[in-house]
Amino acid sequence: MKVFCGRVNPTTGAMDWVEEDEHYDYHQEIARSSYADMLHDKDRNEKYYQGICAAVRRVKQRGQEAVVLDIGTGTGLLSMMAVTAGADCCYAIEVFKPMSDAAVQIVKANGFSDKIKVINKHSTEVTVGPDGDMKTKANILITELFDTELIGEGALPSYEHAQHNLMQETWEAVPHRATVFAQLVESTRLWSWNKLFPLNLETGDIKPHPELETCPGAPSVCDIQLSQLNPRDFKILSEVLCVFRVDFSCQVSSAPTSHPVHFTSLASGAAQVVLSWWEIDMDPDGSITCTMQPSWMYETQQSVPWRDHWMQCVYFLPKECSVTQGEVCCLTAHQDDYCVWYSLNKSSAENDPVCRERPTCHCGAHITWNRARFGELNDRHRTQQYFEALKKVVTPSSTCLCVSDGSLLPVLAHSLGAKQIYTLESSSIAQHLMKKLFQVNHLGEKIQVLHKSADSLITADFEDRKISTLIGEPFFTTNLLPWHNLYFWYSRTALSTNLAKDCTVLPLSASLHVVAVEFKDLWRIRSPCGMCEGFDVSIMDKMIKNSLNFRESQEAEPHPLWEYPCRALSEPIQVMTFNFTEPVPTEEIRASGSLNLVRSGQCHGAVLWMVYELTKEITVSTGLIGISEEMGECQWYPHRKQGVYFFSSILNPQTIPAQSPSSVSYSVTFIPKEGDIRMCFEPDF
């Protein structure tokens, strides 16, 4: 059955009514899931298998039947491991219906249907008894309920309920325990993702609103591939601290609690950020350990496992705190049932009661700007580029309009002497935030914030003035892919009647660029697995492929590529240009050609990004900013996500051609009516 779904188009700003299959949502969830990534995580799979074998063996040595409960079974992989290890029966719980159906098929295909029962319920709804979902309570608890923060997917409440209701009086658990580690650091780069720094201009400093300075920030964890952070970007202030452990073989509590750890500071500095990760011991002895520690904790880089479903965490302290080398401090990890946060005290005094509450943004900035956007606004080199460009177009007679969400361009325009400045904000929270920022810097009367869309503006909004200078970064909070910021072009088109005949537009244009790449690891998230630890999971591969084909097989997907190393196999090329000095055309813009591969390697996909021509002399890239000559290692703009188009024919180990492609053919079409860019890439052999 088909249904009509209303979606705001991020490029045009219009409400699009799209006819979708009724199962679109779960196809999208499967297509964007990390199931394939987990199946490719050999370190994780091997450690789980070893831990499961050991747990079954311990139960059998006590003369008991091994009854396994597997919560969040996914493909059924861990359940099949348990039965292969000698478990008598296994109850595999999976709440997501399409995944549960796949698990039933995978279990059957591997010949385990007689010992594994897949239950399509949330674990808290499972019943035990002669007529229940489980005939008897289990004595082995196997789970993979963890996220990067360990407890963010509700692991603690699930464990708590299962141990109370679904487990025997004593049980074995795989994993047996989890340990959370933390390290206190000073880092201007990371801190710039959480606070707005003062903006130093020739006419004076622009300071953030005091509310932003005292705001504890966003409640969600910042999870990144910490191994890709340059060690020069932070200063270590503490040893790696063991902050708390969770023993899954004992009764777990999801009640809020705190874990204070005293330490002696290794260096003097500004304590700003806590780097954190966890490890799980699969057995009571701790001889089978799976760790999420970053690469610099390993003796050799060859032994570092790569995974994207579990990364590392960056936590921002509520406020910056100076510490002195040799000073005794107390770092406290606070947790509730789903979240962890940190506070720092410089004495053994009781923690500030406020820190016991989950941090919540009260300034509006952490709701308006995500962490990458904070970093972009604090990027001094980028700001200087825009400042130099604005110098060329802003005059004392300029009436400026800024079309970008939460932008500081109006402040730059004012510092250059513009007569009148207006700025559009798409949300009431952003409008309130920017008004406060302008007011605290005595710019409230000089920069007017308009909470309207471009197509709803009338002459009266500009006090009967014509806009002489239209400016934008452009950046909009609704953007997912690089070309979604072409919303600036659609806004410029809607504003045509409000623009002076000789209106200057900055940027002048945007261009779409592409390069063919070999990823070090990111390709794994879209690569079929086939066999995993001796079990056939190809049904899962087909399920993911079907969901990708359902909608996303011919689409790029957004990834912050500074976290994912890759090599350029072709030279980057410009494939399409969008002229902002003219309205959006009615005719489609088409481009086709080929990327000649100049370096050897597995060509996993193409990366796309936008470059903005601010003036004839100044351009800014939201993607590639450098390539090493010899190996072709790419350096990416860190504040935006790039578009990645994976080549399915090369990602499948079973269909990889014997020879590498010599080039990649492309066809790209911009469809003005839809505000969409359709693309097709084909490796040429």
UniProtKB/Swiss-Prot annotation:
Its main location: cytoplasm. It catalyses: L-arginyl-[protein] + S-adenosyl-L-methionine = N(omega)-methyl-L-arginyl-[protein] + S-adenosyl-L-homocysteine + H(+). Pfam families: PrmA, PRMT_C. GO terms for cellular component: cytosol; nucleus. Its EC number is 2.1.1.321. The keyword Transport does not apply. The active site is at E144, E153. Belongs to the class I-like SAM-binding methyltransferase superfamily. Protein arginine N-methyltransferase family. PRMT7 subfamily. Arginine methyltransferase that can both catalyze the formation of omega-N monomethylarginine (MMA) and symmetrical dimethylarginine (sDMA), with a preference for the formation of MMA. Specifically mediates the symmetrical dimethylation of arginine residues in the small nuclear ribonucleoproteins Sm D1 (SNRPD1) and Sm D3 (SNRPD3); such methylation being required for the assembly and biogenesis of snRNP core particles. Specifically mediates the symmetric dimethylation of histone H4 'Arg-3' to form H4R3me2s. This is Protein arginine N-methyltransferase 7. It comes from Xenopus laevis. The lineage of its organism: Eukaryota, Metazoa, Chordata, Craniata, Vertebrata.
